[in-house]
UniProtKB/Swiss-Prot annotation:
Biased amino acid composition, Basic and acidic residues: 30-39, 227-246
Protein name from the UniProt record: Protein DEEPER ROOTING 1
Disordered: annotated segments: 11-39, 220-246
Primary gene name: DRO1
Originating species: Prunus persica
Xref: PANTHER family: OS03G0406300 PROTEIN, PROTEIN LAZY 4
Tissue specificity: Expressed in roots.
Amino acid sequence: MKLFGWMQNKLNGKQGNKKPNTVPITTHPAKQEPREEFSDWPHGLLAIGTFGNNDLKENAAESQDIQEDPTSSEEILDNFTPEEVGKLHKELTKLLTRKPNIEKEIADLPLDRFLNCPSSLEVDRRNSNALCSDSADDHKDEDIEKTISVILGRCKEICGDKNKKAIGKKSISFLLKKMFVCRSGFAPQPSLRDTLQESRMEKLLRVMLNKKIINPQGSSRAASMKKYLEDRQIPTKKESNTEDDTKEKINNGCKWVKTDSEYIVLEI
């Protein structure tokens, strides 16, 4: 507005310089013309971006009319009786309560059922989730059973070790009685060498028995061979004895006997 006043003053000043006598006559219409020209500018500025809607003026006029006539609404309300107002209130409540029923009826339509029904992928996903939950429960049960079996096995091992160490659990009095009453005392534990030797001897005896049982002819042949060898060795011994006797006789054929005076040869 200051800009407009400054422009008007400029225009009025120029006209005043040209026509000093007509200044009071031209001042009033010059001020009124720009007001009429720029009176529509606020509505035009507000209408920018509304694609040329000119309803702003009409809406502003209607709002002004409503503000100017507040008595019209009061007159309309005065025309209704309290009974009519109560009936309207009841009807409004009925309409409001019917809305959810209408929504249910719309949802029951076949098209809505088709659109709202779960897809096959969703059904598969639900089934897979259910199966996964069942499998997880099964795995938990299996883990529990495994832990129980491990615990039982460990308990059995501990019990076996305790049974093996029964002597260590006996009381000192029992051990002393056993040592003093029994002369032999505790039997010594067999060494590894004895066990190995016994096992080897047992194997040899088994082999010998098997041979005797399976090959009795072989054993008889061996006995006959021993007898034959013994018979051959006996005559050889006799022959050697005779040879020794002959040698002694030859050597003892003549002997020198020494006396005080001379040697005498004795012939045998």
